[in-house]
Amino acid sequence: MKLGLNMGYWGAGNDADNLVLAREADRLGYSVVWAAEAYGSDAATVLTWIAAQTERIDVGSAVFQIPGRTPANTAMTAATLDSLSGGRFRLGLGVSGPQVSEGWHGVRFDKPLTRTREYVAIVRKALAREKVSFEGEFFTLPLPNGPGKALTLTVHPVRDNIPIYLAAIGPKNMELTGQIADGWLAIFFSPESAAENMAPLRAGRESVGLTMDGFDVVPTVPVVFGDDLAACADPLRFYSALYVGGMGSREKNFYNQLACRMGYEKEAIEIQDKYMARDYDGAMAAVPFEFIDQTSLIGTPDRVKDRLSAFADAGVTTLTIATYSGDLQERIQTLQTMVDVLEASGLAS
């Protein structure tokens, strides 16, 4: 199992700290640092900046929003980032959600699975430097009855295959991820629920004659070290309440649906009700400690070390940590402690 670092969204108030953390992760031998985007900063610019100031660590999008870029533009960006970084780019993609897709990008959120399948196919064709022609439900290249012609990407990526990851939560999207992606970007990953939640992913691999060998399972896992478990969990309540309660509409919140599938249906409804009523403190208080404990790494280094085996046994290959607690020096220490803990566990690869 390898380690990664998720910097989250740029512009959240800790940007200078994130650069320091990325450099420290690079020094410590972390395998990848990820950047996110929603409707603020774009991940590509952030990753270019990080890549220019690091040497070994991979840089990855978690994720580029599919409705925000044409497939050709994504291929151009991926090839450029891979070239500038010396072959260190990982392309993470996601469909976002209805509110952002339709409200920010002006793209209807219909048939997201079909759109994703077509999108990835075009990106792969472009990155392989084939002439890009495609006829699908959402994308047709070149457009018919016009002057357009099939073109070939002029940039030569450093690698023959830039790895493509998909952020997936629902069962059908998980199955698609297994079929067409090289890795899965997970959130609220619980080892206790992994066998059931990952079954569609494994089925997707099997349906196209593939196994899980070489497939990268990459959950983002918040990490807080300390002796008091309740105190360690408290900084993660806002993060959990925001996603379970406030990401998306009442009818279309994929994180809320995931919490329900994990056995927290009553609590997920309460969190959403309170969050949408702007009772944010109440929403945070409604997040069960057990949910936080299952989906994060909290407690003493020894407790975290023991917990790592559950993640490894569940199939995690790259454990991407998020440091949501403490000042900069404490977060740097968290990066170092995770390296020590992983090595002590005997699970490092």
Question: Which residues does each predicted region cover?
Answer:
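Active-site-adjacent structural elements that line small-molecule/cofactor binding pockets in enzymes
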Residues: 1-349
